[in-house]
C-alpha cells in the first residue's frame, strides 16, 4: 500500500531475505502470497520503482498459522543525476506521515519479545528515551508528566484507558492491557511534538490500530497461561469481495488457579470487520470491551495492622468502545477517512470495614460513569 494514500501498489516485489529466490509480486489489488516459507523468524523486503524499499525484521513464521501483513511503502521523489537505492530500516519512523518528530512505530512482534512486557505496548514504551515505567503496573511517565495525562486512541478515536484495573493502584496505570497482540497491528507511540490532529494530551499518545483479518483462510488460536485463556479467530467473510473478520476473547484464570475470591477477575473482547467495495471505498466495524472485578476480604482480626487489613469490598470496572470507519480513495494521491464511534466507561467501588466487635459497617460507595459519541473526518 502507498503509505500516504493507502492505494494498492501493483507489481511490487516481496521477498524473504536470505532464503534464495523465495518471494512474490503483488497483483492489481496489492495482494501477494508466499508459500513454503521455512519455520522460524524471517526478514521481509518489499520494493517497487519510485518507492523506498521497506524491510520488516524478525517476523515469526509458524507451521500452524499464516502470517497476514499490510506493508506500507513511502514514495521516493528526487531529481538526481544518479539514483542509488539502498534498503533502510527505520523503526523510529511512525506510521503517521504527518509526524515529523517525537513519534515511533510500535511493532506487536517487539512487544511479544520484550522482557516482562506481557505483550503490552505501554510496557514496551518504557524502553524508549524519556519514558519511565513502573514495576507493578503499566503506567508510564513521559518527560516527567503524570501517567494519567497519557492518551489512548484506537482506529483514530480517543478511548478510555484500555487497561485492566486501570487507576486502581495509581492514576494512569493498570495491570494488563486489553489490547491483545493477536488483533493489534503496528501502531504509533508519541512522546512529544504531536501532529496537529492530536489534542487533549499532556504526556504521550498511543495511537493503536486493529489489523485486518486474513481474507483467504480461516485461522484460530488458543492460548492458556497463568494469567488467562486467550481465544482468537480470523478469516474471510467473503473471499470474492475480500472482506474479513478478526476477533479475540480473553478470560482470567487467576481465581481458578488459587481457588479464592480475592483475586483479580477480568474479561475482554476486541474485534474488527472489514468490508472493501469496488466503488464505495472500505467500511470497517470495530470494537473493544473489558470487564474487571476485584473483591478483597478483611484478614483475620489477630493480623490487623492497618485500616486496610480490616476492610472488604467490591470494585467493578466496565469499559467499551466501538465504531464504524469509512475510507474512500478520491484519486491516486488523496483519500478521505471518516469515523463515527461511541465510548463508555463505568466504575464502582464499595467498601466495608470490620469493627472491634466483629460488625461489618458500610464506609463508602463511589460510582462514576461516562460516555461519548465521536465523529471525525479528515482528508489526506
Where are these regions (language model features)?
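Periplasmic N-terminal accessory/gating domains of Gram-negative outer-membrane beta-barrel systems
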Residues: 52, 58-63, 68, 84-194, ...
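Short strand-turn segments of transmembrane beta-barrel domains in outer membranes
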Residues: 173-177, 185-195, 204-235, 245-264
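Extracellular loop and loop/strand-boundary signature of outer-membrane beta-barrel proteins
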Residues: 217-219, 257-261, 305-312, 321-325, ...
